[in-house]
Amino acid sequence: MPLSYQHFLKLLLLDDGTEAGPLEEELPRLADADLNRRVAEDLNLGNLNVSIPWTHKVGNFTGLYSHTVPIFNPEWQTPSFPKIHLQEDIIDRCQQFVGPLTVNEKRRLKLIMPARFYPNSTKYLPLDKGIKPYYPEHVVNHYFQARHYLHTLWKAGILYKRETTRSASFCGSPYSWEQELHHGRLVTKTSQRHGDKSVCSQPSGILSRSSVGPCIRSQFKQSRLGLQPHQGPLATSQSGRSGSIWARVHPSTRRCSGVEPSGSRHIDYSASSTSSCLRQSAVRKAAYSHLSTSKRQSSSGHKVEFPSFPPSSARSQSQGPVFSCWWLQFRNSKPCSEYCLSHLVNLLEDWGPCTDHGEHHIRIPRTPARVTGGVFLVDKNPHNTAESRLVVDFSQFSRGITRVSWPKFAVPNLQSLTNLLSSNLSWLSLDVSAAFYHIPLHPAAMPHLLIGSSGLSRYVARLSSNSRIHNHQYGTLQNLHDSCSRQLYVSLMLLYKTYGRKLHLYSHPIILGFRKIPMGVGLSPFLLAQFTSAICSVVRRAFPHCLAFSYMDDVVLGAKTVQHLESLYTAVTNFLLSLGIHLNPTKTKRWGYSLNFMGYIIGCWGALPQDHIVQKIKDCFRKLPVNRPIDWKVCQRIVGLLGFAAPFTQCGYPALMPLYACIQAKQAFTFSPTYKAFLSKQYMNLYPVARQRPGLCQVFADATPTGWGLAMGHQRMRGTFVAPLPIHTAELLAACFARSRSGAKLIGTDNSVVLSRKYTSFPWLLGCTANWILRGTSFVYVPSALNPADDPSRGRLGLYRPLLRLPFRPTTGRTSLYAVSPSVPSHLPDRVHFASPLHVAWRPP
């Protein structure tokens, strides 16, 4: 028997010296409510109302919503992103590789080509909230690092840049659903509206810049971050703090990026496209002469859109003189002090363009000049603090009445995972680089997933203590110098070494939408899981003698020998690369025979938690205070850690039930020395969860509220309970008796609760003990009418029902190892001929 009853009593310090009787007498006592209540009082488990102040920190565990202060690293490197372009004809490519796909695989791959996201309601936030002031000590530094990260993502084709209300530009290869206008034709069109000669010749883009009808209107009805031409480094100035440098515009239609002077449409642009090499000094003079003449003529009948946008000089269009972009205004102004930004701006003659343009332009649904989520930077991971990671907060979609209920998806539980992966195979794991950014998002989702920044001047002004920005003195010269300060000057000088003339580009406002799925939305994990599981399903069918399995972006391959694994690795890598999936070969890990996956070590002996988790548990117990009420939010953290390793302990989850109860009641929990000792003893010795073996069920258990019965081979047993018990409790006791009497690892029962092996709803002592006795037991469902133990449980030993031949098949969850292929054309050769490990390790269902 797996458990000595005396041992259990001693463990819980319930042993009062009396000798325990047989299990059939003792076990029902553990279901007694009175005993459970006494034990709870002894161990101080039920006392939820405490008057002492709660403890809010245990070791590294703080409450669920408390802020651990992140550390800013001025030396952070922005990671580089490969040009990820998942092939659009991914289904055809898979079919060339493996033959016809199953319905399941096709459905999953169609979900992500392209992904769609249309929430019911979207809350738009001002641009100020684009970059979160997460590091108050390093505001400027964080601003530029975040802005550089966004720029890198845009250049890698992961973001769209909003050009006008209805158009966006991006870099990288376009998908078919993005080519909505003019399919890259060379379009030359002259619009004589209001004296604006606009000529547009543009072979590369998808949306011709002077597009028909509504687009012309949108060029007049600009919003702040307008559509801009992309010829040459001096393309139109970007959404200006204060208008734009109009003379720098090319023959292209005047689609300035920003808020423009309303009169600007009267300017006749005749500069040739070679003018991009003009020095900015000349450009500035031209800009000022133009702007002075056409300063206030907003008579053209078209309303220029100025959504409520608060940059410090953005109002300059409508009140006060109009200047060029905020950064370049410092050129002409007198230095206000030795720390004036004009010293920095005068370092360079050519600061480059105010905005950057993508290789392609597309139409998008109406997108306001707002953001829907904020971004900030953190360390890439605890082991890599040299690189940064962008955190995108789209939590608005998970909150409130309008929250989106994200789709659920199956994750294999520990037992299924062990059944699947516990074998004598050699393993390696592949690292998919930037996995989320593989999955394309439909451009129609862009208005819902907007990030960006309001530009440096506004950002600094909002965070500085200077309140003059609220006095409506927008656009005046002294207002320009309000932002000068020693701290800003020193920060910018240091950043100048890193970013050079890009400081100018990054100081402009920008609005970006996602072109690939972002990590901060609950839809993304679902889509990624669908994607990788479909790909692995295809790989498993292509190589039937191997195993491929994935969880999110973690893909593992298993094969019988190391040589076989290497040839499999080459073949699978080439296949994935042909689909456009980027692997990081330097991070491929070869595990030998024990695989590290999802926090577990899985070998032929079963599964155990990885060492770092075991270490965390030891630290947790070392720091766990006794007799002090611990905040229930901290208990959530503790239970999260202990719950992960619970299946490897003797008593399992039931041992944690007192903690679960206090969390549910939102009350503090006090660990008594006894309960802490009991738990720590449980977690000091972890036992592997073994792979279930297929077999024939020979032992059956059944119970009624008053009695129990067993059928073991041709032997029948029965017994009665001292007092009637709830039916589930009685069935659980019968299963325990069957296990301890027969030692069988396979038991037939007709009770669904016993089958589920979740013993958390039983009386606490019984739950713990039953878990201990039944650890490693597999259950087979047998209908009551066919259960051979049914008669003995009702006290009838004379009647013999024939023993069933009930086969047991271990489950692998929803992972179909043997997805039946649709009929495959005969010319497809077999991949590699090896003795198939599947025939040794797994029996096909």
From Swiss-Prot:
Any Gene Ontology biological process: symbiont-mediated suppression of host innate immune response
Superkingdom in the source lineage: Viruses
Record entry for activity regulation: Activated by host HSP70 and HSP40 in vitro to be able to bind the epsilon loop of the pgRNA. Because deletion of the RNase H region renders the protein partly chaperone-independent, the chaperones may be needed indirectly to relieve occlusion of the RNA-binding site by this domain. Inhibited by several reverse-transcriptase inhibitors: Lamivudine, Adefovir and Entecavir.
Domain called Reverse transcriptase: residue spans: 359-602
Region (Terminal protein domain (TP)) residue spans: 1-179
InterPro entries tied to this protein: DNA/RNA_pol_sf, DNApol_viral_C, DNApol_viral_N, HBV_DPOL, Rev_trsase/Diguanyl_cyclase, RT_dom, Viral_Replic_Matur_Polypro
Polar residues bias locations: 199-211, 290-301
A molecular function (GO) term: DNA binding
Keyword Transferase attached: yes
Region (Spacer): 180-348
Residues the record lists as binding Mg(2+): 431, 553-554
Reactions accelerated catalytically: DNA(n) + a 2'-deoxyribonucleoside 5'-triphosphate = DNA(n+1) + diphosphate; Endonucleolytic cleavage to 5'-phosphomonoester
Keyword set, alphabetical order: DNA replication, DNA-binding, DNA-directed DNA polymerase, Endonuclease, Host-virus interaction, Hydrolase, Inhibition of host innate immune response by virus, Inhibition of host RLR pathway by virus, Magnesium, Metal-binding, Multifunctional enzyme, Nuclease, Nucleotidyltransferase, RNA-directed DNA polymerase, Transferase, Viral immunoevasion
Pfam families linked: DNA_pol_viral_C (PF00336), DNA_pol_viral_N (PF00242), RVT_1 (PF00078)
Region Disordered: start-end pairs: 188-211, 288-317
This enzyme's EC code(s): 2.7.7.7, 2.7.7.49, 3.1.26.4
The record's note on its domains: Terminal protein domain (TP) is hepadnavirus-specific. Spacer domain is highly variable and separates the TP and RT domains. Polymerase/reverse-transcriptase domain (RT) and ribonuclease H domain (RH) are similar to retrovirus reverse transcriptase/RNase H.
Primary role: Multifunctional enzyme that converts the viral RNA genome into dsDNA in viral cytoplasmic capsids. This enzyme displays a DNA polymerase activity that can copy either DNA or RNA templates, and a ribonuclease H (RNase H) activity that cleaves the RNA strand of RNA-DNA heteroduplexes in a partially processive 3'- to 5'-endonucleasic mode. Neo-synthesized pregenomic RNA (pgRNA) are encapsidated together with the P protein, and reverse-transcribed inside the nucleocapsid.
Similarity-based family: Belongs to the hepadnaviridae P protein family.
PANTHER family xrefs: PEPTIDASE A2 DOMAIN-CONTAINING PROTEIN-RELATED (PTHR33064:SF29), POL PROTEIN (PTHR33064)
Remarks, miscellaneous: Hepadnaviral virions contain probably just one P protein molecule per particle.
Designated name of the protein: Protein P
Gene: P
